[in-house]
Amino acid sequence: MRKIRTKICGITTLEDAAAAAAAGADAVGLVFFQGSSRAVDIARAKKITAALPPFVSVVALFVNESAQNIRRILAEVPIHIIQFHGDEDDAFCRQFDRPYIKAIRVQTASDIRNAADRFPDAQALLFDAYHPSEYGGTGHRFDWTLLAEYSGKPWVLAGGLTPENVGEAVRITGAEAVDVSGGVEASKGKKDPAKVAAFIATANRLSR
């Protein structure tokens, strides 16, 4: 049986974390990038993680953050996985004694093809839509057919996913993990519990 893993990213409140966990999310994402409307500080992140049930992974998202600040956050917040969304290289990403996921902003097939060689120590790659000035969470999607034949390092599909299109996305790409933020929001930084539940329910149906 294939299990489609789900991550709800951009969690900013206890209520949204609880809704994601209750719906069956495998992971929640906390954004530590102050340029994002979904950013959280250490105090809020600690409250959110303390309220999560066991076996829900916590992913910390960073964008071109300093190593010093990353270490400070990791020392105070129980983070299971780090997700790098900026211009970090493999040497930078692997230094924090945590598994890491590297986001790849996809423009062409070569971005996908070369990613594993560029980030050999990544636990997984996250393929997201390219935007010239934003580092994810844009609501844009890329050409999913570029992933149809990909068989490299484990990977996560992101970029413009919604409860309505995640089924199609998984069927086209063969994704075994999906990541959503804006597609399940009521407004920037605030999740819609019904959309969260619908997104995860669709992924679960595809897991058969």
UniProtKB/Swiss-Prot annotation:
EC assignment: 5.3.1.24
Catalytic activity of the protein: N-(5-phospho-beta-D-ribosyl)anthranilate = 1-(2-carboxyphenylamino)-1-deoxy-D-ribulose 5-phosphate
Pathway linked to the protein: Amino-acid biosynthesis; L-tryptophan biosynthesis; L-tryptophan from chorismate: step 3/5
Keyword Iron-sulfur: no
UniProt KW Methyltransferase keyword: no
Biological process annotations from GO: L-tryptophan biosynthetic process
One of the record's GO molecular function terms: phosphoribosylanthranilate isomerase activity
CDD domains, per database record: PRAI
Keywords: Amino-acid biosynthesis, Aromatic amino acid biosynthesis, Isomerase, Tryptophan biosynthesis
HAMAP family on file: PRAI
Sequence similarity: Belongs to the TrpF family.
Name listed for the protein in its UniProt record: N-(5'-phosphoribosyl)anthranilate isomerase
